Amino acid sequence: MYYNPKYAAAGLSGWAKPEIHDNVGDFFRTGFTQNSTFNISQRKNDVSYSFSISDTYQNGIIPSTGMTRTGARGAVDWKVDDRWKAGFSANYSSVKVKAAPGANSGIINVVYSAPAEYDLKGTPYHAPGKPTSQILFRNTSFNNPYWWAANDEFSQHTNRVFGNAYAEFTPKLNWGDRYHLVFREQAGLDTYTSNNATVAELGSAYN
């Protein structure tokens, strides 16, 4: 048996048997991805169209991380007559990513540097009754990764719309089958908004 003051500060007895803990294996989890898509397309006479909706849900291997993505697409082509064609396509996507911080604010370095004799997962990550007082095997200038997963957030949310429309004119010039003259006018749009957020609760090492 040996005495660890960090265990005592976390509300445990403080005494522990020498054991080896798999802190890396305990922290990471199995990732999960789910994709769903619905599509409808048809061609009737001189008009063809296609519409689709897609959704992706993903859990990352780091707790509280993941991604959600929703998309929609539509396209229409219309042969007005032997000379004129017109059409458009439009796309929309919404992507939200919850990621783990890196560099000096990272939590993965804490996971990999945790001593094998310290039970990172089994030790409460804050003092009893004091959720803003982190418990960690080292100085709390770094976040306990479990405390971070329960309290902080690093996210990016991007909405994007892009597409184009066209009109095409093919005059009849009696040049035979080898030569054709085509006039095409096309305009497009691509716009997006992106919101990045870092949530650092009271007690976070970021504060």
What residue ranges belong to the model's regions?
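Short loop/turn motifs that connect adjacent beta-strands in outer-membrane beta-barrel proteins
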Residues: R43-D46, R83-K85, K172-L181
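Residues embedded in well-ordered regular secondary structure
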Residues: M1-P63, P101-N104, W148-S155, Y166-T170
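Transmembrane beta-strand segments of outer-membrane beta-barrel domains in Gram-negative
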Residues: K130-N159, Q186
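A surface-exposed, glycine/aromatic-enriched loop/edge motif typical of exported proteins
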Residues: M1-Y2, S93-I135
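Small-side-chain secondary-structure face that scaffolds active or pore-lining regions
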Residues: I61-R69, D77, N91-A103, N159-R160, ...
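Transmembrane beta-strands of outer-membrane beta-barrel proteins
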Residues: Y49-F51, A86-F88, L181-E185
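Hydrophobic, lipid-facing positions within transmembrane beta-strands of outer-membrane proteins
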Residues: Q34-F38, T70-G74, V161-A165
